[in-house]
Each structure stands twice: as C-alpha cells, then as structure tokens.
C-alpha cells in the first residue's frame, strides 16, 4: 500500500517509522521530481528530527541505487574491490585522508571504486583535490570501468552518476543542514563495490550504517568514527568501529597505540583549500615523516583490511607503509593522472 507524503510527514511528527515499501514509494516520488519541493523538504527534515531508522535508510539507498548511472566492472577484477568514503560533515577541515589512502591501498593490491563530489561541508572534497592533482574526473561509466581495470582506481564524480539528485540539490542547498542525503551518498556506489571503508560524522551512525550495509548485501564493511569527531580512523582519539564480516556485525573500539602509534591532535592536518590538501597528500605519499603519513598509513591499512587483502587493520598498515616507502603509492597517483587524461578528447 502506498503512502502519501502528508501521511509520511504525520508519521515523522508522531515519531513512528515509515515502512520499507512506503519509503521506496516516497523516495521514487522525490527522485522522479513528482513530490513538490516544499513537501520533499518537509519530509527530509521530518525524518532528520525523528531520526532515520536502519530500514528507512536502506530503502532510500535502494532507490538511489536504482536511479544511479552504473559502472559495470568485470567480475575478474572485482576481487579485493573496495570503496573508501566518508559521509563528510565532520567539520574537521582536514586534508583528504581517504583520497590519499586510496592511492596507498591501490598500490598494495586493492581495486578502488571511489565515489565523491566537491566540498560541501569541507574545504576540499575528493573531486576538488583530485582535480588539483591533475586527475580527469569527468569520465563516462565505461571509462571509469577501464580506469579500475588498468590503474586499479576509478573515481566516480557523484553528479555524473546521480542525475536524479538534481531534483533534490536545490532543497539540500537551501536547507543548509544535514539530511538523509548526507547519509545516502556513501551507500550508493555506482560500481557496486562489495567491500567498504566508511567514515561517519556521528557516533550513532556507526551501528546504523554498518547494519544498513548488511541489509544492502555488502560483503565486508568497516564503518568508523573518530571520537575527536573525525569521519576517519583517528590519531587524535579512540575510533569506534562497526564491522560487517561473514554476515555478522560486531562493534568495537580501536586506539592509535594498538598500532604502535602515538596519539596526536588532528590540528596539524587542517587545510584551508584544495591546494593545501594536495600538498599534504603528496607529502604523505612521498614518505615524508609526520602526522599526514601516519594517518594515511592507518586508514589505508583499514581499507586493505576491508578489501580482504590484509587479515587485520594492523597487517594492512604494514602493507600500506611498504607501499609508501617503496614509492609505489606515489607512482599510483601518477598512473591515475596518466590513465584518466588519456580519455580527454
């Protein structure tokens, strides 16, 4: 049975859940532009105030995936295939740690399908820093698949893969606050990577997002929240982890000291723009001693664990350090620049 947007809004006001099939229907109305902007804005805020449930988020993500422009990756390259992504919105304004980690993880044997956009809540989104590094981000789905096959990394610029989001973009911009769409981005990888390292902006989302990934059929998901507020594995505090492996969800806490690292503030990782982020990212890839290199090694280690290349985050970190020290991580950046620019007309 379908539900009207007004009925759904009443449910939110009464703090009652919207059921799976109802959420599918409502989300399809939004994606097709068949719900008025006023109603769509009211409903997204109603969900936010009520607090979105695992079922509501999973249903909304299912619809976003339906409407996405997919990237078809050959089965033979789907082993160790992983997405490294953050929800953003952590307000930390650090350099692009997950983007730097992507080069390291790929150099150590992972296949990366990274899905991102321009900075909204941050000074530099993944698209901004990749452009500053010389990567061509305007690829067709076929070119992204080829980039994954040849360079081990494919970057999917979110607006190219979610055309239906044009119906939501003005609402999100005018509201200017976090909505369910901030949570959905990392759940809707157009290449369908079965494994994921996901950073989230709130501790409650660790348990929620990992269970959403479980419902969406992920194989290995590692969801992290640094207790200093970072949507990464942090060096400045303990990190909460929600992990889905072999169909089972576990939640635990990790600390920098577990990996032989000192706890240090993330203050030294802050940047003002994409150019500063680029400089710090290159420092880390070029093995310059310091906090950027350490946090990239740690997060790349977590990505290698999520990709089932390493048996633990600690083992993954050792592989990440080797990839940086050997120059392979820096070479991977140069390779991605070369491969993506070959596609320019």
From Swiss-Prot:
| Reaction(s) this enzyme catalyzes, per UniProt | N-(5-phospho-beta-D-ribosyl)anthranilate + diphosphate = 5-phospho-alpha-D-ribose 1-diphosphate + anthranilate
Record-annotated disulphide pairs: none
Task: Write out the residues that bind anthranilate 1.
Answer: 86
Gene Ontology cellular component annotations, sorted alphabetically: cytosol
GO terms of biological process kind:
L-tryptophan biosynthetic process
Q: Which domain of life is it from?
A: Bacteria
**What are the protein's UniProt keywords?**
Amino-acid biosynthesis, Aromatic amino acid biosynthesis, Glycosyltransferase, Magnesium, Metal-binding, Transferase, Tryptophan biosynthesis
**At which positions is anthranilate 2 bound?**
172
Q: Name one GO molecular function term.
A: anthranilate phosphoribosyltransferase activity
Quote the record's binding site residues for Mg(2+) 2: 231-232
The note describing how and how many cofactors are bound reads: Binds 2 magnesium ions per monomer.
Task: Tell me which cofactor or cofactors this protein depends on.
Answer: Mg(2+)
Top enzyme category:
transferase
Query: Which EC number(s) does the record attach to this protein?
Result: 2.4.2.18
Describe which pathway this protein belongs to, using the record's wording. Answer: Amino-acid biosynthesis; L-tryptophan biosynthesis; L-tryptophan from chorismate: step 2/5
Kindly give the Gene3D superfamilies that the UniProt entry links to this protein.
Nucleoside phosphorylase/phosphoribosyltransferase catalytic domain, Transferase, Pyrimidine Nucleoside Phosphorylase, Chain C
Q: Which residues bind 5-phospho-alpha-D-ribose 1-diphosphate?
A: 86, 89-90, 94, 96-99, 114-122, 126
Chain residues that bind Mg(2+) 1: 98, 232
General function of this protein: Catalyzes the transfer of the phosphoribosyl group of 5-phosphorylribose-1-pyrophosphate (PRPP) to anthranilate to yield N-(5'-phosphoribosyl)-anthranilate (PRA).
NCBIfam families under this entry? trpD
Q: Which family does it belong to?
A: Belongs to the anthranilate phosphoribosyltransferase family.
Query: Whom does it interact with, and what assembly results?
Result: Homodimer.
Protein name per its UniProtKB record = Anthranilate phosphoribosyltransferase
| Gene source species | Ralstonia pickettii (strain 12J)
Q: What gene does the UniProt entry assign to this protein? A: trpD
